């Protein structure tokens, strides 16, 4: 085996060991927080412009290089929600929710995705959870509106 190939394999093994040890690729590769913030700004700008394929690529990169940042997962999930990939969005929101400290937005958006998939019971559970657990008034109000609307729809259906 050539010396260059041995060095390349050793670098690859070192990267794998670092990642398995809990390091994120941005740190292993020496990518600064400022650079990651700039990439996030591009991703968000693409998202706002409706350039969802471009936004998806950037958010995907960000998630790979810093899998501990819930904002990156939220961005990627939001892209999939807008692209009507609701189940994928639900899965990604679950990661964002697990990593976000008392951030109940992913749970609210998961409820929206369940509604889009016609899973009213699961959506209701998400909205009830947000209403019970969230401390942000605006988030609680959004959950309450969804629950009230679902209640009115169910009442109208039972009267028919």
Each model region followed by its residue ranges:
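A contiguous pocket-lining binding segment that forms or flanks enzyme active sites
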Residues: 104-107, 116
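Long, contiguous interaction/recruitment modules in multidomain scaffold/adaptor proteins
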Residues: 1-35
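Alpha-helical adaptor scaffolds
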Residues: 33-105
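Alpha-helical repeat scaffolds
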Residues: 91-95, 125-129, 158-160
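TPR/TPR-like (Sel1-like) alpha-helical repeat modules
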Residues: 115-138, 144-151
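Short acidic DE-rich linear segments
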Residues: 3, 153-160
């Amino acid at each position: 085996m050539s010396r260059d190939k041995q060095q390349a394999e050793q670098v690859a093994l070192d990267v794998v060991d670092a990642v398995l040890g809990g390091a994120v690729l941005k740190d292993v590769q020496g990518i600064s927080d400022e650079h990651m913030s700039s990439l996030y700004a591009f991703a968000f700008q693409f998202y706002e412009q409706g350039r969802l394929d471009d936004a998806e690529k950037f958010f995907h990169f960000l998630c790979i290089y810093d899998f501990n940042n819930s904002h990156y997962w939220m961005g990627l999930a939001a892209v999939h929600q807008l692209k009507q990939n609701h189940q994928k969005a639900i899965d990604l929101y679950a990661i964002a929710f697990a990593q976000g400290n008392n951030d109940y937005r992913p749970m609210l958006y998961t409820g929206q995705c369940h509604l889009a998939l016609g899973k009213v019971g699961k959506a209701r559970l998400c909205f009830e959870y947000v209403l019970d657990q969230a401390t942000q008034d605006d988030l609680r109000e959004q959950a309450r509106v969804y629950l009230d609307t679902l209640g009115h729809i169910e009442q109208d259906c039972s009267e028919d």
